[in-house]
Structures are given as C-alpha cells and as structure tokens.
Amino acid sequence: MEQYLEFRIDEQTTELKMEAFLKKNAGLTKRQISQAKFRPDGITRNGVRCRVTETIYPGDVICVCLEEAGTASAHLENYNDGIRSKDLSDFHSNRASAPVSETSFSLNILYEDTDILAVDKPAGMVTHPTGMHYTDSLSNLVAGYFREKNEQVCVRPVGRLDQETSGIVVFAKNQVAASRLQSVKSPCKIHKQYLAAVSGTLPVDMPGVWHTLDLPLMQDPENHLKMKTAADLSLHSSALSGKIKTAVTHYHTLFSSQDWSLITLKLDTGRTHQIRVHMASTGHPLLGDTLYHSDDKISSCASFSRAALHAWKVSFQHPFRDEMLLLEAPLPFDFRELVSLSGSDLLSI
C-alpha cells in the first residue's frame, strides 16, 4: 500500500535542501527518506524526480511516495512516558505468532480510517503485552479486530496509558503514520487532555486559567514501581543528576466540593506517572491512588478502586490529510457515578 505526501512550500520558507525539509518540516525519518529515494518518482519537485541534495524554493510542490507493503515491522521505540519501551506491541494481525486476545473486554472504537484507529481503553487493561498480560492487553484486542476484518496491519500504539488509566489510545495502521504521530518535531504530534478526580478542595478556575507544575521526576531509588519529584531527592548526587527528567503539567479546576475536586490536565512532557506524582506533591492526590497516597479515606471515596485518571480528549493533525482530528472518550462508569454525587450538571462537560 502506497502513501503519498504532498507539500506546497510557502512564501515564508527560506531556501533549504530537500533532505533538511523532509526531516524538519515533513517529520520523516532518515530511513524513510532513504527508502523513498530509490522508488520511481519517490521524491519529486514540481512533478520532476529530484535528489535530496537539491535546494527547494517558495512555491515548489514536493511529493513523496512512501510504501508500506512488504516492509518489515517498524520497531519503533516509544518515548511517550519517558521510558524507552522495547516491548512495543508491533506484531502483525495476520502473523501466527501474534497472541490471540483472551479478555472479556470488547473493543470500543472512537474513530477509524485507513491510517488511524482510536479506541477507548477500559481501566484495568494494559496497553502492551507483558509477561503477566501476554494475551489480554489492548493491543491483543486490536490485533484480533484487524484479523477478523482480514486486514494485514502491524499493531502500533502511539504512546500508552497506565493499566489503571482509562481513555483514548491511538493506533497507527502503517509505519509512516506511526513515525509522524510519534515524532516530537512533527506537526502531527498528539496532544492529550486528561480528566482527574483529586482529594481535597481546589478553587474553581475561571475559563482559560491554568496552573503549572514544573517538577522534574525520576524513578524512586527505593521502589522501582514509583516515581518521585526531584525535590524529594538529593540533587547534589552526580549519580542521580543524569536520571532526572523534566516534567511539566498544567491543570484547571472544573468543580470542587468539600472532599474532592474535578480537574482537567494537559502535559508538556509525558513521564511515567507524571500526573499522579505531580498532584500528590500538591497535597491533592488522585482519588483511589494507593501507590502515591496511603490514606484509606482517599481510596474508599465514591467507587474508585483505581487511580481516578481518564484520557479524555486528543487532538492532532492527520498524518496524510490537511485535517485536524478532535476525539473524545466518554466518561467511564466510576467517573459518572462520582460526578452524579456532586449534584451538579458536570456530565455535560
């Protein structure tokens, strides 16, 4: 299956080499550019095949042919949560070795086209197959879905959600879409907005008002399952300095009661447990989050038996079309039950 990308160089673009444009502006990898060079009419400028060393100018029309059929698995590395994931579930839907899903969950599809699949992950399900969840991950469900449709697709989740977190997960259906959606330099980078219920009372914010938490994180040296803020660690240790990662969270309070508050969050970075650690550091941990708060009252609030976090909305430019996609996952049952206790009309948010 061939994919074509077309770009019209605007008047504000300064003269630059074709290869530099394809890397910086088109978000293509060195490997993808190299593969395109050797295809007939793989890279053209104004309809004429050209070299990547040529200079492009304002007004030029660039077309790149990117081929998926016959290529090997992308072997992409996932940096979404600040950890290089070697177990990215990049198995093929028609491959005999791809484990069959053994879960009672059904796949809730929010959006699908020839390049992208977006689904609503339930809380309690892992995104990628792991040793303990080799056949009951979200990726297993997606592989089974493609297999039933007789679609030969490599399963490539773009980022991941923690097991306890519900909400939107985007899957790329081809190698090029995956690299464009995952690249931090690409205009197609996915922007997520989360919904969380936290302990305690936070002042409700006016529209457009956001609060920023700029707290670097690293793995807790005493518990590898947890993350900690740099403020909790010795910054004078050279052994730790290289392990500390920048982490920036923005939050906005939608509703507040005497015991809990409903907030929405956006991330500049995507570190492991970033929202959970940052909110715990403010004294307002997520309801149900026993890993970062041991108070029994927190875990027993309403019906939350998990960290109250939901990947609510995503927005991104389509990797092959001049179209902005805005997707939203409905509130899961535990969030709806909690919101109903507030007596406010928050279900319409």
Region spans (language model):
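RNA pseudouridine synthases
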Residues: 1-349
